Amino acid sequence: MDKKKRIALIAHDRRKRDLLEWVSFNLGTLSKHELYATGTTGALLQEKLGLKVHRLKSGPLGGDQQIGAMIAEGKIDVLIFFWDPLEPQAHDVDVKALIRIATVYNIPVAITRSTADFLISSPLMNDVYEKIQIDYEEELERRIRKVVEGEEEET
């Protein structure tokens, strides 16, 4: 990861105010990085704080999946996602998929304000970082070979 990180900012409706406050508090640090956000969250950050944000679709309309695709393509380095654990979301499966893809590609993820505070204040946030990446492609190839050779059934 370069010194300038590409940070995705997402918040469920009941957590948007929290994210807005957090971003406002960390404006100095965040302004040094490239910011991405899902639709409504991005609009709020632009309107209320005057931030330059690359806006994607709203979460329920595919924005979470767009962020996930960007993670898989190596175009997002950090995910800050203030989600609402008490409110069921129409796109809960997208949220789970997003967290899973962030884990597969080993990017830092904060889903609570405390974790976001620790993450943003890390010296690594403003420095070059060489992340360790598990090669899941190799594991997939191994599983495919076993299925083809009849050693185990596909799951």
From Swiss-Prot:
A Pfam family this chain is assigned to: MGS
Domain MGS-like: 1-155
Molecular function GO labels: methylglyoxal synthase activity
Keywords assigned by UniProt, alphabetized: Lyase
Taxonomy of the source species: Bacteria, Thermotogati, Thermotogota, Thermotogae, Thermotogales
PANTHER family: METHYLGLYOXAL SYNTHASE (PTHR30492:SF0)
Active site: 64 (proton donor/acceptor)
Cellular component terms (Gene Ontology): cytosol
Binding site for substrate: 12, 16, 38-41, 58-59, 91
SMART domains xref list: MGS
Function: Catalyzes the formation of methylglyoxal from dihydroxyacetone phosphate.
GO BP terms: methylglyoxal biosynthetic process
CDD domains in the cross-refs: MGS
Family: Belongs to the methylglyoxal synthase family.
Top-tier EC class: lyase
UniProt-recorded name of the protein: Methylglyoxal synthase
Database matches in PROSITE patterns: METHYLGLYOXAL_SYNTH, MGS
EC number: 4.2.3.3
Cited InterPro entries: Methylgl_synth, Methylglyoxal_synth_AS, MGS-like_dom, MGS-like_dom_sf
HAMAP family in the record: Methylglyoxal_synth
